[in-house]
Amino acid sequence: MDQLIIYGSQYGTTQRYAERFSELTRLPCIRSEAVKDLSCYDRVIHFGGLYAGRVKGLRRTLRALGEHTGLVIVTVGLADVTDEENLANIRNALKRQAPGHLLEKTQVFHLRGGIDYRKLSLKHKAMMTLLYHSVKNLPEEQKTAETRAMIETFNTAVDFVDFRALEPIVEAVR
């Protein structure tokens, strides 16, 4: 089976996961910006960082997929992937980006990444600061697990990358 790993990463955690996955599976790995035609592949594994409710690089991957090319989507974000509310938010983000008929036959996995505020672009720092100030004083019952995590990690560097979390994905593509 001819397979390819594609990753869309802004600050590096998604790239780290994709490259480690490539080592574990011995599959080739490319940045989403390099994607052209994927119709020659039996399956594509797309690792995408979650940014502002979107999976980075997924739109380009979806446009390049062949009619019979299988798809596995791996999201990487700051939110706790064991929290059901966070998972529902991620699934909703995917539904906004990918057609339902495609998602029905796509395996989806979620990994926890990290953030280092010192490395954020000016635009992303401004967005995160605005978001932080809009949620920090919300009543506790209105805060989601995602907003709590953002408040706790604001202006710091955190790294939740856990390569052991790749094991179920490795098994799924063998």
What are these regions (language model features)?
Residues G53-R174:
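FMN-binding flavodoxin-like domain, especially the glycine-rich phosphate-binding loop
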Residues M1-E67, I73, E171:
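N-terminal beta1-alpha1-beta2 submodule of the flavodoxin-like/Rossmannoid cofactor-binding fold
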